[in-house]
Amino acid sequence: MTSFDRHPSVTALRSQTRQPRPGTLPTEELRRLCLEAGADDVGFVPIDRPDIASERAGVLQVFPAAKVLISVVCRMNREPVRSPARSIANLEFHHSGDRVNEVARDIVRQLEDRGIRAMNAPMGFPMEASEFPGKIWVVSHKPVAVAAGLGQMGLHRNVIHPRYGSFILLGTIFVDVDIDQDSQPVDYNPCVNCKLCVAACPVGAIKPEGGFDASACVTHNYREFLHGFTDWVEHVADSHDAKDYRRRVTDQESVSMWQSLSFGANYKAAYCLAVCPAGEDVLAPFIDDRPAFLAGIVKPLQQKQETIYVVPGSDADEYVTRVFPHKTKQHVNSLRPTTITGFLDTMHVVFQAGQAKGIDAVYHLIFTGKEPAEATITIRQQTLHVQRGLIGKPDCTIKADSQTWLGFLRKERSISWALLTGRIRVRGGLSRLQAFGRCFLG
């Protein structure tokens, strides 16, 4: 007998009578386990379901054994989220987020005790920061929740639960066991199409016809996260002395950043959640007295005097001036790609539909050097279409050294220098290049 065979742990395990690991769990048993762990609602989706195909690769990369995704819902308290005092709202966001993670972790522990492998993804942060500004999340909770029958996406790009409305946070658990019955999406959208989220959004990110300006949302609401934080750090680095720093950053902003670093990053708005009346448990006050609902919940957020963070020349920049002139604008930097792939993948995020008005053009982008790539960009009727490869006849061709192009986007290289040295070449007229540039933040 080898030393391994004589090891106390090995001999103890081999002497046990172990229960066989279940190959399939009854869905109702799994549901009961999740609800008893503290979830307010739960649904189950096999990983091979077509409606979560976009999530499959990411999940299997971190947990190759995954067979089923469990989507859990935890409610938030409504009145704190509605408060114009966003410290109160953020306290609710933070504690509710922690609750989701606690519930998901408890479910994983109980499954593990039954011999079932499981893994829970974070409700929000931490994420895979090394992938920034690309896809830094392991799984998108929202499409999983929709597939699991926990609601539908509202105009504001949040999942609306049929009962609890927008006042929920989501978690996802990966398990390596099959179930006997998966969940199905709800057959209607709880969104009541009131468009109060459109009216309340301070940067005009939510469009009444259904569009969404993700860059405007991220730039303001996530000011103290992600690239908003790096923008602040660069103000610190660029300041010559304390007086110069105070010229760049107000004392209130410095304290706000300290607060986020000390107690968890705070959202600047999330007004779209605050004003949403959808959901069976939420809807009555809106139906019973709409003017009172508007006066008590929507108007205080619209009338609040606050700093709004926008990229100069963006659609949000113009929107704040036009719709909320009593709010104070502050110009900040946009997302900065670090790779050509990242640039192409995030073009739809930074595209400015308002700035694209009147442009009807097809662009061929040819990148050479360290990161060669080709793409066809169509801007037409204030919409953007990105295709890999060179397709059709272009109105303008831009050929650029990849590192020079990225340096230009990151404001580390001059476009004039790049054109003079031939590192960026344009066929079709510089006016086309200028029109192209107007459509994207930076």
Q: Model-found features: residue ranges?
A:
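Catalytic cores of enzyme domains
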Residues: 53, 96-280, 284-296
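Structured loops at beta-to-helix junctions and adjacent beta-edge loops in soluble globular domains
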Residues: 73-75, 176-178, 368
